[in-house]
Amino acid sequence: MNFTRQRTSPIHAGEIISYKNVDLLRRFITEQGKILPRRLTGVTAKEQRQLAKAIKQARILGFLQFLYKE
């Protein structure tokens, strides 16, 4: 018997992926400021593209830092 695991997205239905939603974006970057891959976060490919775009926009506009010092 094959058992498939039902994956749930870490992004809830009411959450909007936007460069202004900094709390959501911080969940998907490392302490060093790198964007986490989707195999670790469990988001869909479409959500990963939206997250990457929003994180990059937030960095340019100054909502997120490019590098995090230790």
From Swiss-Prot:
Q: Which GO terms describe its biological process?
A: translation
Concerning InterPro entries, the annotation shows: Ribosomal_bS18, Ribosomal_bS18_sf
The lineage's top-level taxon is Eukaryota
Q: Which GO terms describe its cellular component?
A: chloroplast; mitochondrial small ribosomal subunit
Key words, A-Z = Chloroplast, Plastid, Ribonucleoprotein, Ribosomal protein, RNA-binding, rRNA-binding
Q: Where in the cell is it found?
A: Plastid, Chloroplast
According to its UniProt record, where is this protein mainly located?
plastid
Please name the GO terms that the record assigns under molecular function. small ribosomal subunit rRNA binding; structural constituent of ribosome
Q: Which family does it belong to?
A: Belongs to the bacterial ribosomal protein bS18 family.
For this protein, the record's HAMAP family field holds: Ribosomal_bS18 (MF_00270)
Quaternary data: Part of the 30S ribosomal subunit.
Q: What is this protein called?
A: Small ribosomal subunit protein bS18c
* Phylogenetic placement of the source organism: Eukaryota, Viridiplantae, Chlorophyta, Mamiellophyceae, Mamiellales
